[in-house]
């Protein structure tokens, strides 16, 4: 596709999405529920076709030599697809934020002011090898009255094409514009850059991917971008922690799903308890397949014990492992732990384990990440766990949305003012 054709293609996508967004904006909650139910039914009816398309993606990925973790991300089977479809029902049951009015007041001049929650309009989402995202994002966008332009990874192109066509068919069955959901069905990366500059039509960009994608969007976009999804997550074991109970929480944070952004990356251990606890936690996690990148003090405590350890560098502590590797660092006290987190955190999720309420409060006050936990695993940073339903992304920035982005994060508000032929004095 030539540059001229690319520009025309994107302009048409944007124009169609904007027009569709007008029809979506004023749908009732009941109409949106019917739409999502129709999508769930259509996906169920097309299960075999979707799995066949996904099998093509998996075969191509294996032929290209992609690793097992990547293949697992893009794989759909009957159980996984049923779970994705089941999640749509959960979204249907969530309260619809659109139309909510808040902050109402009457001014001295009699003007009645209120704020009403409204859709953003058109959302662009760029993501990698997870076909479930195609469904999740489309459903959340439609629930909030937004049109969406999707650009998935080339690894799931066949899956995404079929899923999006099924969704568009369900939209048409409800008498709504099919361009409420559009997929960029080309792997040409120039189209990503073009989408990032489509500010005439697109109101927000959400990149769901690694650091390279996040940086590209931050540097190239002329549209507001929600950055996030990169987790360099920390857990600090305070000297007043219950060490026996700490073991299970740390294992949960690291081992349950090590390839996700809310998995634990660096364990910080207070020096007061390090001599006993570092060997204890390493032995506990070693049995679960964890490898270790540790500071010099930790290395000295573990040397000769037969564990899979390497000496960490400063870069190690700035790494999102996305694997069964864990960084371990001994720190002098809670303030040293906080300083380390400030230096290396991506702003995603941090935790402290302690039975000292003063230490817990100090940690929560001083650590400024999207989610801060006391005596809990970092794995809870998730839209479903927070009661938000499926999530669009996990934002690590501070403007507009922060943390797991549910339905409300896909809305804005407008001021409504009622007067009695009122003029400004």
UniProtKB/Swiss-Prot annotation:
Pathway in which the depicted protein is active = Amino-acid biosynthesis; L-proline biosynthesis; L-glutamate 5-semialdehyde from L-glutamate: step 2/2
Top-level taxonomic group: Bacteria
Reactions the enzyme catalyzes: L-glutamate 5-semialdehyde + phosphate + NADP(+) = L-glutamyl 5-phosphate + NADPH + H(+)
Per its database record, what is this protein's job?
Answer: Catalyzes the NADPH-dependent reduction of L-glutamate 5-phosphate into L-glutamate 5-semialdehyde and phosphate. The product spontaneously undergoes cyclization to form 1-pyrroline-5-carboxylate.
- E.C. number, please? 1.2.1.41
Gene Ontology cellular-component annotations: cytoplasm
Which of UniProt's keywords are assigned here? Amino-acid biosynthesis, Cytoplasm, NADP, Oxidoreductase, Proline biosynthesis
- The main location is cytoplasm
GO: which molecular function terms?
A: glutamate-5-semialdehyde dehydrogenase activity; NADP binding
Native source species = Shewanella oneidensis (strain ATCC 700550 / JCM 31522 / CIP 106686 / LMG 19005 / NCIMB 14063 / MR-1)
Compartments (UniProt record): Cytoplasm
The UniProt entry, under CDD domains, shows: ALDH_F18-19_ProA-GPR
Q: Which residues cross the membrane?
A: none
* Name the UniProt record assigns to this protein: Gamma-glutamyl phosphate reductase
Q: Which Gene3D superfamilies does the entry mention?
A: Aldehyde Dehydrogenase, Chain A, domain 1, Aldehyde Dehydrogenase, Chain A, domain 2
Q: Would the keyword Cytoplasm be found if you checked this record's keyword annotation?
A: yes
Spell out the PROSITE patterns in the cross-references.
PROA (PS01223)
Gene Ontology BP annotations = L-proline biosynthetic process
Family, as annotated: Belongs to the gamma-glutamyl phosphate reductase family.
């Amino acid at each position: 596709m030539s540059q001229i054709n690319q520009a025309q293609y994107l302009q048409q996508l944007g124009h169609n999405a904007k027009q569709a967004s007008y029809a979506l904006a004023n749908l009732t909650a009941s109409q949106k529920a019917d739409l999502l139910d129709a999508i769930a039914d259509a996906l169920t009816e097309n299960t075999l076709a979707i799995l066949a398309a996904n099998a093509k993606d998996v075969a191509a990925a294996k032929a290209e030599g992609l690793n097992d973790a990547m293949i697992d991300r893009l794989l759909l089977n009957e159980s996984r697809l049923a779970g994705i479809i089941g999640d749509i029902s959960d979204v249907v049951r969530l309260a619809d934020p659109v139309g909510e009015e808040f902050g109402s007041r009457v001014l001295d001049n009699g003007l009645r002011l209120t704020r009403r929650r409204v859709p953003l309009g058109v959302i662009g989402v760029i993501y990698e090898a997870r076909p479930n995202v195609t469904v999740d994002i489309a459903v959340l966008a439609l629930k909030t009255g937004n049109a969406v332009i999707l650009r998935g990874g080339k690894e799931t192109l066949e899956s995404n094409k079929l899923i999006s066509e099924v969704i568009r068919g369900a939209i048409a069955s409800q008498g709504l514009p099919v361009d409420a959901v559009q997929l960029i069905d080309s792997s040409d990366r120039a189209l990503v850059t073009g989408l990032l500059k489509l500010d005439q039509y697109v109101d927000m960009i959400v990149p769901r991917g690694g650091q390279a994608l996040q940086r590209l969007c931050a540097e190239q976009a002329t549209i507001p971008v929600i950055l996030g999804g990169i987790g360099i997550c920390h857990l600090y074991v305070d000297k007043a922690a219950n060490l026996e109970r700490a073991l299970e929480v740390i294992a949960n944070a690291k081992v349950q799903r090590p390839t996700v952004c809310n998995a634990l990356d660096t364990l910080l251990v207070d020096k007061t308890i390090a001599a006993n606890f570092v060997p204890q936690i390493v032995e506990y996690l070693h049995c679960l397949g964890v490898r270790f990148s540790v500071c010099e003090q930790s290395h000295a405590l573990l040397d000769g014990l037969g564990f899979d350890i390497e000496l960490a560098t400063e870069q190690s502590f700035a790494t999102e492992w996305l694997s069964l590797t864990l960084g371990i660092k001994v720190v002098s006290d809670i303030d040293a732990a906080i300083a380390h987190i400030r230096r290396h955190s991506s702003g995603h999720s941090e935790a402290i384990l302690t039975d000292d309420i003063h230490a817990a409060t100090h940690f929560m006050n001083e650590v400024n990440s999207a989610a801060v936990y006391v005596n809990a695993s970092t794995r809870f940073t998730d839209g479903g766990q927070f009661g938000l339903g499926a999530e669009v992304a996990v934002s690590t920035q501070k403007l507009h949305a922060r943390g797991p982005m549910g339905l409300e994060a896909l809305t804005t508000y407008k001021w409504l003012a009622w007067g009695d032929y009122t003029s400004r004095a």
